[in-house]
Amino acid sequence: MSLHRTELGQTGSRVVFCHGLFGQGRNWTQIAKALSADHRVLLLDMPNHGRSPWTETFDYLDLADIVADAIGDEPVTLVGHSMGGKIAMCLALRHPELVERLVVVDVAPVAYASGREFVGYIETMRGMDVASIERREQAEEALREAVPNPVVRSFLLQNFRRTEDGWRWQVNLDLLGEHMASLTGWPGEALGPATYDGPVLWVGGAGSDYISDEHAGEMDRRFPRNRRVLVKGAGHWVHSEQPEVFLEVLRRFLA
């Protein structure tokens, strides 16, 4: 499978970014441009998202292998947020030779109890009468009641694209909705006792509940060289809510 990719920078070590659910590689553009003077940056659209192909199932180990193929043979600093963070962790555990450093953003190597919020988004997006949409403003209005937060609504609508056949969702809503348990889960049993012994930066939003002290034990077991940083004034989307702080933390880790 060939993933859609955007490359920036011509010199320095490689940094690869994996976005989260409903995201695209371009979500990292601001951070990537800032790094591109000193690093070769690769932004990937994850399978079932953006311009990348769709899969028939959702399995973190398979997704990690697909991203590993996209990376190639040269070790990289791998950065992943949320769903992309789980893909990145699985990749580091399965292909440690490809990962020089790992950055995990606001997610832990655990199964989360519920994906109700995400299921609600998917049901709303699937329920939209796409055939009747002529302008993006109509799509935004259709989402307004179920997704009152304008920032989240704008984020979801990045996946709504006009094609020759009219408007459509770029994200594989049917698959993600059907496999929400796998998406919020963690393939710990399938990974066995695997650990990753390289340096790991574990970044969380101080206002998010995706990272907590109760997750630290499993993080320490799988990634014994992790360093945890909480960013004030940020929730789950740390790099979007506090981009300058996130960039500074990342640069220090890369130095």
Predicted regions and their residues:
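Flexible "cap/lid" loop of the alpha/beta hydrolase fold
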Residues: 93, 100-135
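Active-site loop/oxyanion-hole signature of alpha/beta-hydrolase fold enzymes
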Residues: 33, 42-80, 87, 248-251
